[in-house]
């Protein structure tokens, strides 16, 4: 298996646990992390001994608390993108999302803490979503003047219905784990 800077991959008893670990950035997805995620998923997909993939966010290094599953795309990296660079980033980011959706292994998002923007979207790309009590979901992109990327508008509407999806997207309001369960965004709290 490959070595990663922003991911940790553990395989045991036919289960791969893939942990996104960028605690200083609340596990936000930058280009390097997306490339590593794509590499890891490609390697996992090719292994017959792995039946289940659990995607989760790593803890904060200071207090070991789980503050963020994935806080979205890394805005600090994106802020200086030109239009062609932003388009290329969106295309690059969509690859691991579609890979998650189409894997032969069962994919589970174990959501702990923030799942905002791209974090909510990567969770929705998984077959099953399980949220901890401290999970917070949201689509804050409209507050930045953009729409949810990475398939977020389509997946959210399929999971929670068009009305709820529009409300979450247009208002940029976050919801807690219990509300996410109530509306069908997660399978279990």
Predicted regions and their residues:
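Conserved CoA-thioester-binding segment of acyl-CoA-metabolizing enzymes
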Residues: 1-58, 84, 98
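Hydrophobic/aromatic residues within transmembrane alpha-helices
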Residues: 18, 55, 74, 122-124, ...
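Crotonase-fold acyl-CoA enzyme core
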Residues: 99-189
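Histidine-centered beta-alpha loop that forms part of the nucleotide-sugar donor binding/catalytic region
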Residues: 21, 73, 112
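Hydrophobic alpha-helical membrane-association signature
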Residues: 33-36, 89-92, 122
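C-terminal alpha-helix plus adjacent terminal tail
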Residues: 1-13, 58-66, 172-178, 189
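Glycine- (often His-adjacent) and acidic-residue-rich active-site loop
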Residues: 57-96, 115, 145
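Phosphate-coordinating loops and pocket residues in cytosolic domains that bind phosphorylated ligands
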Residues: 28-31, 71, 80, 170, ...
């Amino acid at each position: 298996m490959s070595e990663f800077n922003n991911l940790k991959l553990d395989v045991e008893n036919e289960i791969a646990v893939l942990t996104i670990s960028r605690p200083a950035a609340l596990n936000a997805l930058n280009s390097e992390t997306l490339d590593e995620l794509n590499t890891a998923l490609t390697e996992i997909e090719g292994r017959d001994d792995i039946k289940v993939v659990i995607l989760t966010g790593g803890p904060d290094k200071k207090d070991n608390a789980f503050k963020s599953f994935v806080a979205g795309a890394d805005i600090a990296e994106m802020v200086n993108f030109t239009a062609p660079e932003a388009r290329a980033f969106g295309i690059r980011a969509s690859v691991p999302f579609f890979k998650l959706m189409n894997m032969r292994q069962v994919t589970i998002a174990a959501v702990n803490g923030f799942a905002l923007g791209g974090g909510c979207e990567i969770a929705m790309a998984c077959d099953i979503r399980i949220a901890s009590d401290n999970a917070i979901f949201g689509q804050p992109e409209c507050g930045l003047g953009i729409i949810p990327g990475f398939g977020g508008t389509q997946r959210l509407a399929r999971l929670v219905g068009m009305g709820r999806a529009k409300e979450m997207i247009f208002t940029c309001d976050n919801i807690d784990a219990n509300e996410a369960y109530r509306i069908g965004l997660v399978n279990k709290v």
